[in-house]
């Protein structure tokens, strides 16, 4: 675990992940950058609170929405929250341009390319990866060129 992220375990989310996502959606919908995209949020009810740094979770979700809106026009960006025993999973999906197989494989590694947009995309996902793993979680993505992207991350309900 990175030293500068090691303090995350001591932070606590006040409220549920669902509450945090509703707040992010409300704040993000006021941004003029949505490019005529619809931002949709679906959450599973009854999920317990988790131990997490809310500022870092907001950073991750906001970055994922920003990536989605940058690659989607006149489409839909969906944030979903689901739970299974011991874990809560957030997915930010879009109906945008999607990624090539090479880009998808390297996105979480912080791969830097000469392509300016690819560099920005890869570094942002790398930072998200670092934050989620510092919380004891995992992050992965699915994407296909021309069909959009889904970025998932799961967080443990109990501290690991």
Q: What are the language-model segments listed below?
A:
Residues 124, 128:
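Short alpha-helical Gxxx[C/S/T] motif in the catalytic ATP-binding
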């Amino acid at each position: 675990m990175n030293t500068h992220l090691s303090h995350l375990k001591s932070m606590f989310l006040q409220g549920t992940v669902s509450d945090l996502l509703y707040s992010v959606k409300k704040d993000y919908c006021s941004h003029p950058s949505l490019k005529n995209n619809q931002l949709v949020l679906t959450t599973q009810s009854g999920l317990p609170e988790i131990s997490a740094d809310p500022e870092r979770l907001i950073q991750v979700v906001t970055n994922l929405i920003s990536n989605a809106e940058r690659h989607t026009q006149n489409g839909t960006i969906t944030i979903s929250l689901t739970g299974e025993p011991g874990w809560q999973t957030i997915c930010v999906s879009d109906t945008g341009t999607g990624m090539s197989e090479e880009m998808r494989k390297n996105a979480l590694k912080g791969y830097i390319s000469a392509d300016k947009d690819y560099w920005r995309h890869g570094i942002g996902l790398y930072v998200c990866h670092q934050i989620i793993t510092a919380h004891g979680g995992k992050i992965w993505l699915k994407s296909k060129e021309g069909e959009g992207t889904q970025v998932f991350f799961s967080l443990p309900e109990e501290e690991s």
